[in-house]
Amino acid sequence: MIIDITEIMDWIPHRYPFLLVDRVLKIDPNKSITGIKNVTVNEPQFTGHFPARPVMPGVLMVEAMAQLAAILVAKSLGSTKNKEVFLMAIENAKFRRIVQPGDTMHIHVVIDQQRANVWKFSSTVTVEGEIAAESKFTAMIKDKA
């Protein structure tokens, strides 16, 4: 099931310049999700990171993983309209390859565990078949206030 940017914005609250998922390529609710982020030079982080050699910040790669996980949670639950997904912990984040404008990040997220409102994930970002980043992280789902 492919999910385009319009539907992505129905599932998560993020918007430009902080929406970091362009398309969902595959989703298996309660299991895994794969999506992409096309990295372009006109994104605001590249004005300072770094002007002479733009490099995608590692924390934004982890944020893209977390946003894709939020879509997976929403699709697994059927809706998160009255809920919010909060990142609680990031573990073992590793950055193995520079990601720069022109690259397409392929992001894969797997649910490792889910207990009540706490979900644990593992994720990788690949570019041209090479691992660029990997991380484990935990998120909490809460009712909106």
UniProtKB/Swiss-Prot annotation:
CDD domains: FabZ (cd01288)
Active-site residues from the entry: 49
Gene3D superfamilies: Hotdog Thioesterase (3.10.129.10)
Biological processes per GO annotation: fatty acid biosynthetic process; lipid A biosynthetic process
GO molecular function: (3R)-hydroxyacyl-[acyl-carrier-protein] dehydratase activity
Cellular component GO terms held in the UniProt record: cytoplasm; membrane
Keyword Transferase: no
Entry-linked HAMAP family: FabZ
Name assigned to this protein: 3-hydroxyacyl-[acyl-carrier-protein] dehydratase FabZ
EC number from the UniProt entry: 4.2.1.59
Primary enzyme class: lyase
SUPFAM superfamilies: Thioesterase/thiol ester dehydrase-isomerase
Any Pfam family the entry gives: FabA
Organism: Rickettsia massiliae (strain Mtu5)
Keywords: Cytoplasm, Lipid A biosynthesis, Lipid biosynthesis, Lipid metabolism, Lyase
Family listed: Belongs to the thioester dehydratase family. FabZ subfamily.
